[in-house]
């Protein structure tokens, strides 16, 4: 097999989830549902065993959706970064909030803590990441360097702190959490019981997405905005190594 890349345009696409026959994409103001149109044994253009076609879009408004998942009931659950909460689509409104960090006193379109990552376990939300413990408009920006949090959704407990711009937590089979400590330029594993963390890999770009497949971590790296990483530790690490940042998909063997 080989990697096949096909580009399709969605305005400010960030969140992505799927179950084989369905893909859900979060864009600037909508959640798009794409369905596979091929049956068993069918191929498109004699090469592809999936053909995803847009079938529905739900208007959320400007929620800055960073990540989403499909829960055990088949609902789309998404990280509503603008309103600092987890949410589901609403038939009447743009969304219905279902959870928020306990330090958020009001759900307002103010991106207070930059809630951005969601880990599901057995079809329910398990962990989230936030860039900083803040309860004011854009308050997270003062915590970019070392203020990041990994939070247990069920208990509101902080599992890990002193992270830098954390993203994309994922629960491993042993119960530990694999995630991107993006500002430090690392893929890390966190023990949710004791909080101990270990570096799995160092990254040559800003990590923004992570998936697990058959013992492999598949992650995406971004280049800096405006030519620099804004003083993050990642920038210092790359300079010290004499390495230029890359925009790439990286596959890491976890076995």
Regions found by a protein language model. Give the residues of each.
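Short, conserved, GDST-rich strand-edge loop motifs in beta-rich repeat architectures
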Residues: 33-42, 128-145, 220-243
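Surface-exposed loop and turn segments in beta-propeller and other repeat-based domains
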Residues: 41-61, 94-113, 132, 157-158
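Loop/turn-rich, solvent-exposed surfaces of beta-rich toroidal or solenoidal domains
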Residues: 165-242, 247-250
